[in-house]
Amino acid sequence: MKAAVRYYTKTGNTKRLAEAVAKAVNAEALPISVPVKEPVDVLFLGNSYYAFTIDPEVRDFIRSLDKSKVGRIVNFGSAAMLNSTWKKVKAEAEKVGIAMDEREFHCKGEFKGMHKGRPNEEDLKAAAAFAKGIVG
């Protein structure tokens, strides 16, 4: 199964998760500014809530995806207060005809003194194990 990893981060938390996910699935963690050019079975997409929704750059990235090159999207991320962006990402993925995996990985992320040190080593190991479980 071929996988790609893209992420969007403002704090660096999601990048750390993306690197753990990428290592687990034998891919490279790249920012969403790098398009998905080769066909993949799974696109791991790392993101978080910003101002109570996904960042417009994440929305634009999803809208730019070629459904003939992406089998499905697997969501992952971290946040200090809110939880999953899954529903928001799914809504955008549906607009471009890309399936959204029901499974996702989410953990707490450090922000303005909250959840100091997160994601931590345990979170990174859990993200890697999650990704391995997706690709088999």
Q: Residue spans of the language-model regions?
A:
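FMN-binding flavodoxin-like domain, especially the glycine-rich phosphate-binding loop
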Residues: 3, 9-28, 39-136
